[in-house]
Amino acid sequence: MKKEILKEIREPGKSRKKKGQPKGRRNGFLEGLTGKDFTAAGLFFFSLLLCRLFVLQYGVFGSSIDWISQHSTLADYFRKRFYATGNLFPDFAWNLGGGQNIYHFAYYGLLSPTVLLSYLFPFIPMDLWVMGSSVLLYAADAVLFYRWISKKGLHYGNCLFTSLFFTCSTALLYHSYNQLMFVNYMPFLLLALLGVDRHFQKRKSGLLILSVLGMILTSFYFSVGGLLALTAYAVTEYLKCGTENAAYEAEQENRKVSRNQKAGAEKKQRAGEKSAGTGETLVGLRSFFGAAIRFALPVLAGILLSGILLIPSAAALFGGSGEGGRGTAAGGIAGLFTDPAMWKPQFLILRLCYTPYGIGLSAFAGVALLGRVIGKSRLREKLLSFLLLVFFCIPLFGYLLNGGLYSKDKVFIPFLPVLCAEVGLYVENQLVRKRECGKNRSTGNFKRKVMTELRELLPYLIVLILMWNAKQETYFEPYWHLGILDVICVTACYLAWRWFPAKKRLRGRELPFLPLVFSAVILAFAGKAINQEKHVMIPRKTYEALTDSKIAAAIREIRAEDPGWYRMEQYGDGGQNLANVNRIWDIGQNVSTIYSSAYNAEYKKFRDETYGINEAFRNRMMQTVSDDPLFCQLMGVKYILAETRPEGYELYRDYGDFQVYRAISAAPVAYVTDQVVSETEYKSLPYPQNQEILETAAVIPDQEMRKTTAAIPDQEKSAKSVDNFRAAADSDTKNGSVGPLFHSCFQKVNLEIPETDQEDLRIQKTADGYEIETKKSVTVSATLPGAAEGATLLAVSFEVENQKASHDMFIRINGQTNRLTGINHTYANGNTQFNYLVTMKEDGTVFIRMGKGHYILKNFETWTGMAQPLEKTEQLYSQAVTLIGGTTATYGGDGITGVVSAERDGYLITSIPYDENFVLKVDGKETMLFRANTAFLGAKIPSGEHKIVLVYHAPGRAAGSWCSLMGGMLALILVICEKKKQQNGSERAGESKMLQKQRKYYIIRV
């Protein structure tokens, strides 16, 4: 009886008339449209309505988290670079982070189809394109999911409300305007699921290949979870139709044998059908592995096609770059498999429910998943639910999908479609069981019925307990009551519907999806609450100020007047600095800032440890603009757009809302000098002398210094040591070996912070610093007794011990901020050494802003001083490299060409972060590169005039190109073979029909 009902309800591919199902329209321009088309259109507009209600009424469809600083700005840079160079597959980004491997930004859509499509529409601003495409992709998710689920043979109402359930996922909408790569691959994943069905039903792989390719190009990080979900779905779909596949394989084998072997082939076919029919959960190994290979080949073709992105990105991530995250367990990835904790199940219900950083469904998803696993059905029917439960509960999978860095629930978002499909099948099976109950009400004993009902009710009780235990979670606490209400409502709906007499219907309908309806409604309210509670939408006025076209016009105007090779940055408050960290207004603009999950590790180490600039943000991957005037000079920041004048800069132009300041003496991006010190000597200098010396000398490796010293005669050594700048010793320098190198313009002073002991604020002086406890952020004024006359710069350095380690704390001195992140933050910056180098106020007052918390400041030291004399810095920078054609004319923007004239043998010094994949040619001859200033490109240069060519070759680029070529060939072979099989099949079908006609004609004649 159950088998007949299942066949009646779930048999795919047949058109059934159901009560309440929309009929096809046959009038006017609507002719040919079916009820499914109108339902899909309704879901499309419903998605747009959610975007309006949840996001757009509060601001633009973008957030202040990563959207404004990464997704919109980096996509805009990719397009600008393409327009300037015409290079669709670049290797290097000269404009960002001082110069970075462009595959550090591959995560943000370097080759994403939606970004590449924007190249055809230069008249549409990229931020508007990103907003519009995100809205359309979200709406496409709803439509494609409905198209996929409606092919499962489910009740029309079940398909509709399962699609609404999917659309209301908090993760799907929230990340459509926050971290786009979390969800922007979803349309391709849904197309791939349709491609799996098409592959098994029609033996066509084109859709599957293209969908896998699109998913990887859009978000290679989340495509791993997507491929795992695809594989699990493909295995279960194959096992569900195991009988048909076994019979098909036997038929194929039968066609290959001759007539003399027909009896044996028929025997093999009968044996295959018998094993498939009796086992019902397994198929023959030969058939299974054959199907597995046929499925793996198109997936492999899609992966190989994306090699042009995957291999260079992997080389950039694991070949010496930095990457965000906590790090793996001991032993790396392999160590995860031997760690017993990785195999211990964890039942984290919030991994599925109510948080945008998980799958983001309601509690009913957990009920359905457990119900499918616990329920009475064949193993092959609930295998997918069982696999999903294993993926969600075994910690090993969370770590592996996160690359071994940490266990974050975001990597399970690709399982959203298959989980929602299991929810729909759970509801459908409830209808089947109720029909069975109605038709067999008098059969069966009471004890069996009670046990069946308890088994059906058990998932609701388990989820209720899990939700109650999770209510204390930080991000779930504001709306845990919605989760409890959800479980109670769906349980009540289930009981009311389950025990309602089977033959009595509600207005002629059985409504098996009533719990799903209530759950979808509660999920929609939860989504509204979550989006409001996060409150990361950007108000329109703020967005318009950040993207003001006047800024772009000013930068283009400056570039037209001064087309040299330098850097130009914006400095404002914290929100502006974060929003502009990756923003390039004009392709000629270069910045020293970068915010990416991957970056040049040499440059990051130089900023944080060697040079010691301030860290203003809690995320350690944010390498934002600094108002440290010596760092700006070192990095060649010639122009700064700001509201106040930094030390060492003069007003260049006033645009009303902002001003442009020009450096009096900024370093060229590349220059030649012979004023050098060894790396050992440099590292012996304390702060702030380690910053100050780079105004008058460059740092080269010890071995290069020894070569230079050995090549200079003794008399020249003596003359050279007296000449140039190595004259006066610094009385404040702690290491005597560095004393003769330069004369420091800084001297130690005492910074006196007034002590206080109030209810909300306590400041107590200690032996080597201060202990501060404040219940809110406060600003205090400090004095500098004994400050040097004419001092313009203030340097402060101290260590921080945070007494509330789980909470953030910050200290801001004269507008410059240092922040220490709580230890529980995933991307905690670990910034316990606070360094400040700021411009002093005219009256000498120091304003200190202290953040809420309890912390101890140790080894508190203060200096005042001024920049090195102008003649010394000009002498260091006098032999600058002049570019020919800018940074876009050589090798598709992956190289630069310049000329330089060196008076004496010296060194090429740059502020381009060191990377071993650079190739330098001086007058056509390849020259060895080394680390200058401990982290930048440098090389030995002889005297005379030279032509310099510096080219970057992204590692893995050639291998990726060959991989994509192989993938294209494999895809072409698969398509051709499938076409031939279809043609042969149609020819055999035609021959069979002809034989039948001939036989019929013969019988009639006889």
What are these regions (language model features)?
Residues F222, L379-T547, S943-K981, G985-E987, ...:
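Contiguous transmembrane helix-bundle modules in multi-pass membrane proteins
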Residues G226-L300, V490-L495:
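Perimembrane helix-loop-helix junctions
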Residues R16-K17, P22, L74, G739, ...:
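Active-site-proximal, structured, solvent-exposed surfaces of multi-pass membrane proteins
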Residues S47-A142, L164-M186, L317-G322, A330-R351, ...:
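Membrane-interface coil-to-helix junctions
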Residues G98, H104-Y107, A520-T542, E557-F631, ...:
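Extracytoplasmic/lumenal acceptor-recognition loop(s) of multi-pass membrane glycoenzymes
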Residues F44-L48, S134-K152, Y156-K240, R294-G319, ...:
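Membrane-embedded helix bundles of polyisoprenyl
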Residues M1-L56, G290, R294, L495-W499, ...:
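Start-transfer (signal-anchor) and selected internal transmembrane alpha helices
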Residues E253-N254, A291-I413, K471-P478:
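Periplasmic/ER-lumenal interhelical loops and adjacent helix-loop junctions
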